Amino acid sequence: MIMRQTKLYPVVMAGGSGSRLWPLSRVLYPKQFLCLKGDLTMLQTTICRLNGVECESPLVICNEQHRFIVAEQLRQLNKLTENIILEPAGRNTAPAIALAALAATRQHTDCDPLMLVLAADHAIANEEAFRDAVRGAMPYADAGKLVTFGIVPDLPETGYGYIRRGDVVPGATDAVAFEVAQFVEKPGLETAQAYVASGDYYWNSGMFLFRAGRYLEELKKFRPDILAACEQAMRGVDPDLDFIRVDEEAFLACPEESIDYAVMERTADAVVMPMDAGWSDVGSWSSLWEISAHTPEGNVHHGDVISHKTENSYVYAESGLVTTVGVKDLVVVQTKDAVLIADRHAVQDVKKVVEKIKADGRHEHHMHREVYRPWGKYDSIDAGERYQVKRITVKPGEGLSVQMHHHRAEHWVVVAGTARVTINGEVKLLGENESIYIPLGATHCLENPGKIPLDLIEVRSGSYLEEDDVVRFEDRYGRV
């Protein structure tokens, strides 16, 4: 197969708000934005995995409420180039990939670019094997095939869908791909054992490679309603900082469907490229334990942990010391506002705990005590009747919106850095150990004019203290 000169356009799916890694994963800060292995988040690791593959800057698709998290993580990699598509609501993978394909064809009018579709929350141990599989699949995709990457199974996993391979694709290169004979739903154990023994089945990874135009052609053939809704949503694109904000009303009218059901199971041009790269979808605490580095006792430690007579356990300490004595096969995860203790073999039921938290009207499933904003972050240290205490960190050169509150007053004490505070038009500079009072109803603004982070303690007092008591008059992040 001879490839034409073409451009490879990575598309990273960063939607979703999974509950299986609670309490680390929350609705407002799901697992793809967490550092679970090493210093990079799962999203950042997914992007860096492409180092060594010649490609364009990635296009990331995410939920609107995660936009500033994604932007900051791309900025840290120097990959922020107006390349974030915001979904007003999740509509599964077929519509999301359609938005990316439409964006890619708009941006690259001189060619039909190859789209490498990746999930932001997968772990891959052998990254060179991953890159080899991508390079091997490119000639097939360039020739018009829709490539799905099939993971070579090393055990009879019942939690994944499978792909049964057919004949070798004619004209195969050194990297052999197979026609897709069948997509199979998650099997029972005996069936999965037979699949693995046969050598004809792969795990369905949810990673794809195809030309943007070919995907749109097949989507038009099999699900024209999805394509029409996405085209309408892209016609109403509203550029917003580094974001591509599609028309909300049009996209909400789009049917919800996966790419497997909408296209891959119907097209005559689906091929599977085998990949043996130590892949995991990190779908539970037990799978994270399996892919992490272990102590001689089989334990995985994160943070300040001391274990004694402990075996085959995962222990995560976010804040403070966590100790274990005389236990085995446990998952212990401690965050600032919640602790999970579970049998490592029963972690599939963590989602039931999350459902209970949600049903009880609590907030621990939704957000962490520490919350990230485009200007920095805040940590809710304490709260009681008619008061809240927060530690606020503002990044250098950033600032909060010009705002006012109907139901609360605020006291600010600068801990580190310099604060520029505007209250009812009067500007004051505050240094360390200086404080200021913001009366109820006052129009005010907080900025960091310095070169180091600004840290301050905020004490709120009033009859209603939640975040939605805010009226914004000006905002550099488009939140007015």
Swiss-Prot record:
Coiled-coil spans are none
Tell me what reaction this enzyme catalyses. alpha-D-mannose 1-phosphate + GTP + H(+) = GDP-alpha-D-mannose + diphosphate
Sorted alphabetically, which InterPro entries does this protein's record hold? GMPP_N (IPR049577), Man1P_GuaTrfase/Man6P_Isoase (IPR006375), Man6P_isomerase-2_C (IPR001538), ManC/GMP-like_b-helix (IPR054566), Mannose-6P_isomerase_type2 (IPR051161), NTP_transferase_dom (IPR005835), Nucleotide-diphossugar_trans (IPR029044), RmlC-like_jellyroll (IPR014710)
Task: Reply yes or no: does the keyword Signal apply.
Answer: no
Protein role: Involved in the biosynthesis of the capsular polysaccharide colanic acid.
**What PANTHER family has UniProt attached to this entry?**
MANNOSE-1-PHOSPHATE GUANYLYLTRANSFERASE (PTHR46390:SF1)
Family of the protein in this entry: Belongs to the mannose-6-phosphate isomerase type 2 family.
Name of protein: Mannose-1-phosphate guanylyltransferase ManC
Q: Which organism is it from?
A: Salmonella typhimurium (strain LT2 / SGSC1412 / ATCC 700720)
